[in-house]
Design a protein with these regions (language model features):
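Alpha-helical scaffold segments that mediate packing/assembly in large oligomeric complexes
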Residues: 95-164
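Short helix/loop capping segments that flank catalytic or ligand/cofactor-binding pockets
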Residues: 53-56, 91-92, 182-185, 269
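N-terminal "assembly arms/tails" that initiate or stabilize quaternary assembly
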Residues: 1-81
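Extended, compositionally biased alpha-helical segments that mediate assembly or anchoring
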Residues: 242-289
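Acidic Ser/Thr/Pro-rich low-complexity disordered segments
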Residues: 57-60, 190-193, 314-324
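Short, compositionally stereotyped local motifs that mark structural "simplifiers"
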Residues: 282-324
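Extended oligomerization regions of viral-like shell subunits
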Residues: 39, 44, 161-246
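Long, hydrophobic/aromatic-enriched structural stretches that serve as scaffold segments
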Residues: 70-109
């Protein structure tokens, strides 16, 4: 009779921490965001809905009204996301090849090997791809960066975010390794002051324009993207481990098995999309449509692609159910 080992929350947490140590994306997003799972693959994200300020009016009689203006009940926005990635492992340890006892320690060693070589690279590449694709700002560069142009290009992209109200010093600059050399060789980078006692996420190489600089293997970075800037609250990467267990004396073989399953995904928050910005090759950016309104009729013109629109002011890129 096979014996199943179910690994507790403490062991799962230790593996999650191990994943985060070397992940290039785990430090970039907010892990404490207000999220609620519905079933195994739907997650709801809640955010306080803010309104415009009132004008204090001293001429209002307090017995008949409020000098503070209209009373508005505090509400929230709820965003619903569907987890599309459902990955699994089913690995066997044949008794003829295994002299060690199969237990939590053995399972942990196997899982750490898979985290290093398979799971972490896959998740990092997927997250970067989704965040870059769904970013609120895409800037096309006329030519690939060089050591004489990259500094100005990074500052211009960062300024575009700040102009949209994004916090100045809360972002991470992701840059492909094949472009990092141009930043490091730029005169402005060479002349930067020492970071002193600042603590930076492991694997980062410094700060520039208030941004933590995170190099990424060119193989993990999306094609036609040179660099990207992400602010923590603008990107999320929800996940849920559904199964993690060891099976001793498996009925299907003379040995033991380790089974793992995880559902996950990555998204850009619709109302904070300006906190995700990407510098791309010109060929990778869709031209912005033009809208002309005359006599109550809107005419939309676009050079390419399919144009989606909404009637309530929401962004059709993220709320596809309401887009037309």
């Amino acid at each position: 009779m096979a014996e199943t080992i179910h690994f507790g929350e403490k062991f799962r947490t230790s593996l999650a921490k191990y994943f985060a140590i070397k992940s290039v994306t785990d430090h970039a997003f907010n892990h404490n965001i207000d999220a609620e799972f519905s079933g195994s693959d739907t997650v709801h994200i809640y955010e306080i809905a803010t309104t415009e300020l009132n004008n204090y009016n001293k001429s209002v009689d307090p017995s008949t009204g409020s000098r503070f203006g209209n009373v508005v009940e505090v509400g929230d926005h709820r965003y619903t996301f569907k987890l599309t990635q459902d990955v699994s492992l089913d690995r066997a340890v044949d008794r003829g090849n295994n002299d060690a006892v199969f237990n939590i320690k053995k399972a942990g060693a196997i899982m750490k090997a898979y985290i290093d070589k398979v799971i972490r690279p896959f998740k990092d590449k997927y997250r970067l791809g989704k965040w870059c694709t769904e970013a609120g700002i895409h800037v096309e560069l006329a030519a690939a960066p060089t050591k004489s142009t990259i500094v100005e290009q990074i500052i211009d992209l960062h300024n575009a975010m700040i102009e949209e109200g994004v916090p100045e010093n809360e972002g991470t600059l992701y840059i492909a390794r094949n472009n990092l050399k141009y930043l490091k060789l730029a005169a402005e980078w060479v002349g930067l002051d020492s970071l002193g006692g600042k603590t930076l996420p492991k694997g980062t190489v410094g700060m520039f324009d208030g941004l933590v600089v995170q190099p990424v293997s060119s193989r993990k970075f999306p094609a036609n993207c040179y660099f990207a800037i992400f602010v923590k609250d603008s990107i999320i990467a929800p996940e849920k481990i559904n199964t993690f267990r060891g099976i001793k004396d498996s009925e299907n073989m003379d040995g033991d098995r380790l089974q793992y399953r995880c559902k996950f995904d990555a998204f850009v928050m619709p109302n904070l999309a300006a906190g995700a910005a990407v510098a791309c090759a010109a060929s990778a950016v869709t031209k912005t449509p033009t809208v002309a309104i005359s006599s109550g009729k809107a005419t939309v013109t676009s050079d390419e692609g399919v144009v989606y629109y909404t009637l309530d002011g929401s962004d059709p890129r993220y709320l596809s159910a309401d887009a037309k």
